[in-house]
């Protein structure tokens, strides 16, 4: 979902001086982390961190990682698969913009994808971790669209703290689809699963 590396630059406040890993080390770490799962990875999204380096230095981190994992990459994609002959389309993009409130983040997500037809929409930019659904009337009866913010692993502090943004604990989302094409989700929050690892109280 993007932002796989810190990609600090001297043009972005003091990020270059606060980075804890070199970009080379980050690339090695990301590639080695995902290699055991490479057969299940079909696409990598560019995030705003990767796009920053591409813009400033003409360095495409996502391409380097995708080539190492032998998968496609880009800004956004729609992937499809079948569950009992029903086609499920999944739209994914890193996303853009920020919001202090979950309800304004949800409305922006819907608005930004209104011209895209899919069953499941995935977005990661705003660091939230949640899933919501909207019933859609069709000639075949009610269908559902599922929207998911996929979470993040960035601790609270620095920019978030100075802007008084809400604390969004590190989290990830597990989506599942059963044989009857029912989409369910489970969220794993660090403050509920491993509170001792949190960087703030």
PLM regions: where:
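A general structural motif
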Residues: 39-41, 87-88, 117-118
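Conserved beta-sheet core of the metallophosphoesterase superfamily
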Residues: 90, 96-185
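C-terminal accessory extensions appended to soluble enzyme cores
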Residues: 19, 171-201
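Active-site glycine-centered loops adjacent to acidic/histidine catalytic or metal-binding residues
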Residues: 3, 47, 94, 124-125
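Short acidic-hydrophobic surface loop/beta-edge motif
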Residues: 76-85, 133-139
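Active-site glycine-rich loop that binds ribose-phosphate moieties when present
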Residues: 67, 73-79, 99-108
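Core catalytic region of metal-dependent phosphoesterases/phosphodiesterases
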Residues: 1-73
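Core dinuclear metal-dependent hydrolase active-site scaffold
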Residues: 78-98
């Amino acid at each position: 979902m993007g932002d796989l590396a810190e990609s600090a630059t001297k043009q972005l406040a003091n990020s270059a001086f606060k980075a804890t890993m070199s970009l080379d080390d980050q690339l090695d770490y990301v590639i080695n982390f995902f290699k055991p799962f490479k057969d299940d990875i079909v696409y990598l999204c560019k995030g705003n961190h990767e796009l920053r380096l591409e813009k400033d230095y003409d360095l495409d981190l996502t391409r380097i990682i995708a080539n190492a994992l032998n998968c496609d990459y880009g800004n956004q994609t729609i992937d499809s698969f079948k569950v009992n002959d029903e086609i499920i389309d999944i739209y994914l993009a890193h996303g853009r913009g920020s919001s202090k409130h979950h309800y304004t983040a949800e409305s922006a997500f819907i608005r930004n994808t209104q011209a895209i037809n899919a069953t499941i929409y995935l977005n990661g930019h705003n660091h939230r971790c949640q899933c919501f659904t909207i019933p859609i009337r069709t000639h075949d009866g009610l269908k559902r669209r599922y929207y998911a913010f996929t979470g993040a692993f960035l601790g609270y502090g620095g920019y978030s703290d100075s802007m008084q943004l809400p604390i969004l604990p590190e989290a990830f989302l597990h989506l599942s689809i059963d044989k009857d094409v029912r989409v369910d989700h489970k969220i794993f929050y660090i403050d509920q699963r491993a509170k001792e690892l949190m960087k703030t109280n």
